[in-house]
């Protein structure tokens, strides 16, 4: 037990490391979740048991009402070695994203008025543009690391557009699958134009993204983004299923989280690194940063479903419970309230299930444990990106990982 705890602590400590060949991990898994080689005969600690030990031993855990408050552990990345605060990643990223949504609308090339209105509905400049911001910052950080180049290539900026288009297409399709009526504080495409037309609008955005991607002319990059689209579909199928065993259930949840959210960020980061730097070590650093930030982003999103109001989120809260989906806070809460198992297996389908499950989550430490897990993913992301040569953009990516943990919508 002591040896395993020591290994886990070494795996999660937050400190810079030299550039080297990063260890490959299974998508969607952090080090304490991974299985060891077959030759390792030491007893395996079930994931939830290990997390229970960690949560009781960690001095940086928060109460439910304080989980978004910054702690020394969370904020050790806030300053550079020179003592200066990091640049605002969003302001820095927008230097390369001026005209982003206008450029996307040009890519759509639509003559039919109704289809044009549907396809452009979410490209109104009111989104967070989280993915394009990460992509352009990663592009510059990798370019500087490679040859101190200060300029970003047009092909790298195109990846930012493609990433936002793929993401938006999935929002349109997800809203159809979930029968959602609001997003970003306004009616969904399917609510206004109907499900059939919404599906076609999402398809059109995906096809336009594919054309823009093909113009880049790099087969490796095309393959990476094609993998994203496959992951998105497989992730949606995973979300439709459930597992009876609690450890399988959590692994299932993390795999779904990787495929539905983190794969796009990870592969987009890797794509711009490939376009700007020939070193495969840098490609892996970019991928691992994007993967870990992406998983953390979704974990916090799942937390906000229980802790934010609908006005803040721009969409209904407790939405996942209403759809029969058990996210991190629910799975952790189930450890304290085993009666939730039956609710999870029947996908909260009986009258009163959603309200009872929500109360169980808020009475448990499910929110804190999910937030703590998100912290660990962000720590891993920071350790990866610190392997690159120091730059304003690299530091902004570190700051961005903190903003993932402290966001409220």
UniProtKB/Swiss-Prot annotation:
Q: What class of enzyme is it?
A: transferase
Q: Could you tell me the superkingdom of the organism this chain comes from?
A: Eukaryota
Q: Which residues form a coiled coil?
A: none
Pathways involved: Cofactor biosynthesis; ubiquinone biosynthesis
This entry's Enzyme Commission designation comes to 2.5.1.91
Q: Where does isopentenyl diphosphate bind?
A: 128, 131, 167, 184
Q: Which cofactor does it need?
A: Mg(2+)
Q: Name the GO cellular-component terms.
A: heterotetrameric polyprenyl diphosphate synthase complex; mitochondrion; transferase complex; ubiquinone biosynthesis complex
Location in the cell reads: Mitochondrion
PROSITE patterns, from UniProt?
POLYPRENYL_SYNTHASE_1, POLYPRENYL_SYNTHASE_2
Q: Does the keyword Ribosomal protein apply?
A: no
Signal peptide span per the entry?
Answer: none
Note the Pfam families from the entry: polyprenyl_synt (PF00348)
- Which Gene Ontology MF annotations are present? all-trans-decaprenyl-diphosphate synthase activity; metal ion binding; protein heterodimerization activity
SUPFAM superfamilies with a match to the protein in the record: Terpenoid synthases
> Which residues of this UniProt protein bind Mg(2+) 1?
174, 178
- Which free-text remark accompanies the cofactor? Binds 2 Mg(2+) ions per subunit.
Single Gene Ontology BP annotation: ubiquinone biosynthetic process
* PANTHER family in UniProt: ALL TRANS-POLYPRENYL-DIPHOSPHATE SYNTHASE PDSS1 (PTHR12001:SF69), GERANYLGERANYL PYROPHOSPHATE SYNTHASE (PTHR12001)
Function, please?
Heterotetrameric enzyme that catalyzes the condensation of farnesyl diphosphate (FPP), which acts as a primer, and isopentenyl diphosphate (IPP) to produce prenyl diphosphates of varying chain lengths and participates in the determination of the side chain of ubiquinone. Supplies nona and decaprenyl diphosphate, the precursors for the side chain of the isoprenoid quinones ubiquinone-9 (Q9)and ubiquinone-10 (Q10) respectively. The enzyme adds isopentenyl diphosphate molecules sequentially to farnesyl diphosphate with trans stereochemistry.
This protein's name: All trans-polyprenyl-diphosphate synthase PDSS1
Tell me the organism: Mus musculus
Lineage at the top is: Eukaryota, Metazoa, Chordata, Craniata, Vertebrata
The encoding gene is Pdss1
